[in-house]
Amino acid sequence: MRLSVRWVFFLGFFLCALMLAIAGYFQFVENLEPCPLCILSRVAVLAIGGVFLVAALHNPKSWGIKVYALLGFVVTLIGIGITGRHVWLQSLPADQVPACGPGLNFMLDNFPLTETLELVFRGSGECAEVQWSFLGLTIPGWTLVAFLFLGVISLWQMGRTGGGAGKLT
């Protein structure tokens, strides 16, 4: 049994939706406030999920599959960069952690976008704080694993041909 291209794009979308639901649970139920890098990670997940959903609904053929998969892969690389930086910040010794900076909303309101992004990627103390872990991985660690999986899905889709109308064969 072989999954159609459409179903694989839906699978990628549902993984992104699950990731955002888990992020919402942590924020609104467990009261874990997201740091600026967490928010950027969510934006990347939302973008990848959007690409996968549009691809699944469009059900492209041949080159269209490759275009959507390439777009998803590029956004996945951005997500890997964001979460990789976040994991690195969390692995720093306490004396090397950058000082806490202003919140993302404050930076967006008061600084140009380029300066805001530079400050966010430089990182701050709040981004280095480990608030939760499971099986030895923090939230950014699990997010990095998910981005890697989404990247594999994108690469796999690039190598496939034919869409099919949602068939499992």
Swiss-Prot record:
Required for disulfide bond formation in some periplasmic proteins. Acts by oxidizing the DsbA protein. GO terms for cellular component: plasma membrane. Gene3D superfamilies: DsbB-like. The chain crosses the membrane at residues 9-25, 44-60, 68-84, 142-160. Residues 1-8, 61-67, 161-169 are cytoplasmic. Disulfide bonds join C35-C38, C100-C127. PANTHER family: DISULFIDE BOND FORMATION PROTEIN B. This is Disulfide bond formation protein B. Keywords: Cell inner membrane, Cell membrane, Chaperone, Disulfide bond, Electron transport, Membrane, Oxidoreductase, Redox-active center, Transmembrane, Transmembrane helix, Transport. Belongs to the DsbB family. Its main location: membrane. It comes from Nitrosococcus oceani (strain ATCC 19707 / BCRC 17464 / JCM 30415 / NCIMB 11848 / C-107). SUPFAM superfamilies: DsbB-like. It is found in: Cell inner membrane.
